[in-house]
Structure formats: C-alpha cells, structure tokens
C-alpha cells in the first residue's frame, strides 16, 4: 500500500512539473510574440513613417491609449491612425528604437502585458538628432488565434536630476 501511495505521489509531482514547464514555454512564446510585434511596428515606422496601416496592423479597433502629448485618453484605432498619419507627415522621423528591460506578464493564456523602457532617436529635417526616452506599457489580448494590441500607456522618462 505504501508503494502504491509513493508511486501516486511521485506521479502527481511529475505531472505538476510537466504542466508548469508547459505553461512556462507557452508564456515565453507569448512574450516573444508580443515583443516581436512591438519591434515590427517600430521597424515599419522607421522604414516609412507614413505606413500607418502597416504600423497598426496588430492594433484592435477598440484600442485605447494614454500618452504625454494629449491630456485625454485616445479612443479607437481610427482616431489613433488619424493622429499617426498627421505625425507621419512631420519633417522629423524616428531613426532608432530599442526596448530595454522588457517584462511580459501572461494571464490565462489570452492576456499579455508588456512593460519596458523605450530608447529611441529622432532626426529633424536639418539632420539634428534627439534622444527619446519613455516608460511604456502595452496590453495585448488574444482574439481567436491572433494577438492584438488593445491598450497602451506611454509616459516620458526624464533624465534623473543631477
């Protein structure tokens, strides 16, 4: 009887370990996917600042955003796209974008929250470059079999006071 109990306990432990490892692999695949989507958006913007459709292909129609440029929440992919199109016509452009300290939290396999520090570089029409720093959060939801960006919050990350 003791041997049977020992086998059952060992079996349960092995199953729990296997399930946990499988969940961790799925979470890592999700993390890799949402980070890659974010970097692809940046690459599309760098390649062509007017390619708003390409930049927002993974954005949900009900997308919302907070950022330091506007005092209110921006509601909807359509509104965000119109503002991005106007920004794409500006004389300056993004020439570099990097993600530092990324962290992805996955919930129930269909919600992913990506937080990171953004380090970028813009260039104006005269060739002058300006570094850009931000603290960022993006929320993704799996709709069907596709991850979609549903919310983002972008905040400035000022240099520390000396």
Q: Each predicted region: which residue ranges?
A:
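A solvent-exposed, acidic/Ser-Thr-rich amphipathic alpha-helical stretch
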Residues: 28-33, 50-110, 131-132
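Bacterial N-terminal signal peptides
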Residues: 7-16
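A short, structured loop/turn motif at beta-sheet edges
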Residues: 104-112, 127-128, 140-146
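Solvent-exposed loop/turn segments at secondary-structure junctions
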Residues: 70-72, 120-122, 154-158
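Generic short beta-strand segments
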Residues: 61-62, 116-123
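Short beta-strand edge/turn micro-motifs at domain boundaries
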Residues: 133-158
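Short, low-complexity N-terminal intrinsically disordered segments enriched in polar/charged residues
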Residues: 4, 19-58, 149, 160-162
